[in-house]
Amino acid sequence: MGTVNKPVVGVLMGFGIITGTLRITNPVRASVLRYDDFHIDEDKLDTNSVYEPYYHSDHAESSWVNRGESSRKAYDHNSPYIWPRNDYDGFLENAHEHHGVYNQGRGIDSGERLMQPTQMSAQEDLGDDTGIHVIPTLNGDDRHKIVNVDQRQYGDVFKGDLNPKPQGQRLIEVSVEENHPFTLRAPIQRIYGVRYTETWSFLPSLTCTGDAAPAIQHICLKHTTCFQDVVVDVDCAENTKEDQLAEISYRFQGKKEADQPWIVVNTSTLFDELELDPPEIEPGVLKVLRTEKQYLGVYIWNMRGSDGTSTYATFLVTWKGDEKTRNPTPAVTPQPRGAEFHMWNYHSHVFSVGDTFSLAMHLQYKIHEAPFDLLLEWLYVPIDPTCQPMRLYSTCLYHPNAPQCLSHMNSGCTFTSPHLAQRVASTVYQNCEHADNYTAYCLGISHMEPSFGLILHDGGTTLKFVDTPESLSGLYVFVVYFNGHVEAVAYTVVSTVDHFVNAIEERGFPPTAGQPPATTKPKEITPVNPGTSPLLRYAAWTGGLAAVVLLCLVIFLICTAKRMRVKAYRVDKSPYNQSMYYAGLPVDDFEDSESTDTEEEFGNAIGGSHGGSSYTVYIDKTR
């Protein structure tokens, strides 16, 4: 869907988890069967058909399939639409996945032009009796195409093209009157012998009024990606949810379609709860016999074929005469300015002396302002085989007069300001009015430095090397200036195998003469007194180590003697506000005669003698 000035959400093209009672309807036999909790009583169904659950892995859709005669082939594991029965329990877990938001990528990336919204009243449908139906065209205007019903049953209604291919979105606005019927007809394309699965979902707009009501607006996701789509306000989305109305599966057999009936699975209880009749579903058709306000909203139709084809359509159903919905206010999108440039190139090119080759910069652009000035410039610095790597400070291309770029360290291994580089070639387009294709319609003036002996091609984006000598090895930098400002930078190292060096692009300014490079850490060197003898240094180290060992030994002996004189155990003299006392592990012999009083006190405290057995005592003073 799209965006407006305040936060909005798009109508989701997927389907949520299926709940409720299934109502399976065979329109041809006019029989209605009800089953709860997805359990099918096959004894009550047609004995010539087998109904099996299956899951669309690409679109997280679930359904029941009337396999018919194909049931004799058991399960078709090669089909992307039929899953083995043991996977049936898993499809509900993934049923919450969606196609996406805002219909992004549908009919845009494929290069097809999106259809503009059309006003199609329910009265424009001439009815089944006449054999004539109104089909919206895909040529970007508001005209309609009238085709015969029999023609719609065979292949593509648009010039009879039977080649399967993805279709762009069909965006159709339908105006209806209260208590009148209306029919939604999808611009369907079918191929003989292909099994199709169609799904209908519905986003009601009953709770969405005023500015929150769904409306068709002009959406721009990017400067170059704009289209018409249905926009749903975020306040509306919080009060409503999308329902999957039904799913229909059938194999298209032309005029024999009536001999192989389709099966419709109604998976929504929305209209049952409102005590309204659910819409009638046929291949590519949704019918409502008596329109009430509960039927207004967004309907999404999706069709997939077993041959891999897919198409879908979005219908916005509103009251007839609703001027707000009929003539929606386009969303305010900022006018793009400036230009966008993107380049693809190799960062290195290895050659042999005498080779002829081309160095190309593949430039893609979108220019939003005209007239404009464009400068394409090639710069060069020689490479030093001892430099590993060469460093390109691209910041200096944007600030060529900065002091750090004009005076820096290691100038032979860096590329900084263009003022310090050699100009190889340049192409200028001045006061150009043609933003779509400036190379074809604008005058470009090129200049080549004769000392290099190179040839400029492709409007200034390609350098051709002929009988290349080794002296042309170097770092070549390509810069795009738009109206005097740097817009894009690219580089390539051209060298022989023997003198190849790598090049990297650095962010920020290069280090100055008094500043070490940020990427290297200077080594700390401890000065040594040249008058000190190695023998004296060795003696000093040995003496110091011996002193440390002796000190540690003395401390160890003192601690050991002290521990031999301490009490065998002691009671922690904790204050009485604590809840526990902790006693240690007693031993058999007590060498300290001064510990008798404490031991007796401890024995009396616990109500017995301590003896000589080992134990740990926890005394709770609260007892």
From Swiss-Prot:
Superkingdom: Viruses
Modified residues (Phosphothreonine): T596, T598
Phosphoserine, modified sites: S593, S595
Post-translational modification: Phosphorylated on serines within the acidic cluster. Phosphorylation determines whether endocytosed viral gE traffics to the trans-Golgi network or recycles to the cell membrane.
Side of membrane Intravirion, spans: 560-623
Pfam family, one: Herpes_gE
Topological domain ranges for the Virion surface compartment: 31-538
Annotated GO MF terms: enzyme binding
Region (Acidic): 588-601
Glycosylated residues (UniProt): N266, N437
Gene Ontology biological-process entries: entry receptor-mediated virion attachment to host cell; symbiont entry into host cell
Keyword Transcription regulation: no
Major place of residence: virion
Extent of the signal sequence: 1-30
General function of this protein: Envelope glycoprotein that binds to the potential host cell entry receptor IDE. In epithelial cells, the heterodimer gE/gI is required for the cell-to-cell spread of the virus, by sorting nascent virions to cell junctions. Once the virus reaches the cell junctions, virus particles can spread to adjacent cells extremely rapidly through interactions with cellular receptors that accumulate at these junctions. Implicated in basolateral spread in polarized cells. In neuronal cells, gE/gI is essential for the anterograde spread of the infection throughout the host nervous system.
Self-association and partners: Interacts (via N-terminus) with host receptor IDE (via N-terminus). Interacts with gI; this interaction enhances the Fc receptor function of gE. The heterodimer gE/gI interacts with the Fc part of host IgG.
Name of this chain's protein: Envelope glycoprotein E
Organism, scientific name: Varicella-zoster virus (strain Oka vaccine) (HHV-3)
Species classification: Viruses, Duplodnaviria, Heunggongvirae, Peploviricota, Herviviricetes
Encoding gene, per UniProt annotation: gE
